[in-house]
Design a protein with these regions (language model features):
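Intrinsically disordered, low-complexity activation-like regions
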Residues: 1-75, 79-124
Length: 124
């Protein structure tokens, strides 16, 4: 089942900063079980309507940029959606969504550029 953007954000916020950047097999498994179908829909371009608002765009960036780092940890698949995440983040930033986002979550609009192999992205 494809989760809603609200479900993605509720899960991510409930997990909190302690889980966001730590290696935790149980957390990785929970993301994979709950959100793999949502990730696959996003990669297939079926969630482009999530770009419409700050909250839904934030959820889409998390699905495309953060979730694969947990779901596919240690495999090449971890990075497959990076170009898509950068595109969503770029359009969200152009619309000012980052500036409207609380500081604790704002970084998620910037991380796709940090993860990029291209120096120009990292210097943004």
């Amino acid at each position: 089942m494809i989760a809603s953007a609200a479900d993605v954000l509720a899960f991510w916020r409930e997990a909190g900063e302690d889980k966001w950047f730590e290696k935790d097999t149980a957390f990785d498994d929970a993301i994979r079980t709950r959100f793999l179908e949502t990730y696959e829909a996003a990669v297939a371009g079926r969630l482009t309507d999530w770009e419409a608002t700050r909250e839904t765009a934030l959820a889409l960036v998390i699905v495309l940029d953060q979730f694969p780092r947990n779901m596919f940890r240690g495999s090449a698949r971890t990075f497959w959606a990076d170009p898509l995440a950068r595109g969503v983040a770029d359009r969200a930033i152009a619309r000012g969504f980052d500036a409207e986002t609380p500081v604790a979550e704002r970084a998620f609009f910037y991380l796709p550029f940090e993860h990029s192999e291209m120096l120009a992205d990292q210097e943004r």
